[in-house]
């Protein structure tokens, strides 16, 4: 039997049985939910509604990093031979943030055959002056990230890969979370969010990684924090940034050394990356 026809018959049988057991209103409600998930993907579960993003943009309209009331977060991103498609998607995700409290620090170690990386970044710099860039010698992921940190002017730092995407409300949400921690008298040195994996479009993630609140034993076993992690630049400076001898697990090593100073990390339960 055709797989789709078999599936359709199974769904029809389920609908009939559900109507008998729980009534027509319940069946219609569950059916509507099924259609929404099938036709519109998982976006509603991972990203805020359009009106929420519009409200954030309206709140921040006409404001700069200096007067928006949110802590400035400098995003550290080493570039290396980044494909144009991924680079543009990443830069677009920064330019289109709902709040202006982000700074994007790019350290480009691309080889001579990928000079277009610099050209593309310079194109985006004309759109957004909060993108800073420098060309560097390739010394590995940790050293290249440290080079990006030398460009940072923010009170906080974040790590982002050159072929990933920030959720449109990432900087706004992290900035608000920091302010909330301060208002509650809680430590604000280290925060992390949930994240989603996707292939072709951020609108249709394949799976989300919903993380637990700070779990020290789990962190010792694996880097469950990953992205998006935000931490005070003063802490980064104190521990000396990332260690080149830990290339390949440099972020995990960094986070373990950070929590030695902060005694934990605050979980922001939203998909921001």
Give each language-model segment a name:
Residues 21-93:
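N-proximal low-complexity "stem/linker" segments adjacent to membrane-targeting elements
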Residues 92-101:
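Short, acidic, metal-binding catalytic loop of nucleotide-sugar glycosyltransferases
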Residues 101-112, 132-137:
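Short beta-strand/loop segment that forms part of the nucleotide-sugar
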Residues 108-119, 161:
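A conserved acidic beta->alpha catalytic loop
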Residues 136-152:
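Glycine-rich, basic loop-to-helix element that forms the pyrophosphate-binding segment
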Residues 157:
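Short aromatic/hydrophobic "clamp" motif used to bind/position activated sugar donors
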Residues 169-205:
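Conserved donor NDP-sugar-binding/catalytic core segment of glycosyltransferases
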Residues 216-273:
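Conserved nucleotide-sugar donor-binding catalytic segment
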């Amino acid at each position: 039997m055709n797989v789709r026809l078999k599936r359709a018959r199974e769904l029809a049988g389920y609908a009939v049985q559900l109507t008998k057991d729980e009534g027509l209103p319940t069946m219609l409600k569950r059916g509507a939910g099924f259609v929404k998930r099938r036709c519109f993907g998982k976006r509603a579960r991972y990203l805020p509604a359009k009106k929420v993003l519009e409200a954030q943009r309206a709140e921040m309209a006409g404001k700069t990093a200096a007067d928006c009331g949110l802590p400035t977060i400098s995003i550290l991103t080493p570039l290396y031979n980044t494909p144009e498609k991924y680079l543009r998607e990443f830069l677009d995700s920064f330019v289109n943030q709902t709040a202006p409290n982000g700074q994007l620090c790019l350290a480009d170690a691309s080889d001579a055959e990928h000079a277009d990386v610099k050209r593309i970044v310079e194109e985006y710099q004309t759109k957004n002056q909060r993108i800073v860039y420098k060309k560097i010698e390739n010394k590995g992921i940790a050293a290249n990230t440290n080079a990006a940190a030398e460009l940072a002017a923010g009170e906080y730092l974040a790590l982002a890969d050159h072929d990933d995407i920030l959720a449109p409300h990432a900087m706004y949400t992290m900035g608000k979370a920091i302010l909330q921690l301060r208002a509650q008298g809680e430590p604000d040195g280290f925060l992390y969010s949930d994240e989603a994996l996707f292939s072709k479009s951020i609108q249709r993630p394949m799976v989300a990684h919903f993380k637990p609140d700070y779990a020290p034993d789990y962190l010792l076993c694996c880097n469950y924090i990953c992205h998006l992690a935000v931490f005070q630049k003063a802490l980064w400076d104190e521990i000396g940034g990332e260690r080149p001898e830990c290339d390949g697990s440099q972020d995990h090593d960094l986070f373990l050394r950070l929590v030695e100073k902060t005694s934990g990390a605050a979980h922001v339960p939203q998909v921001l990356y």
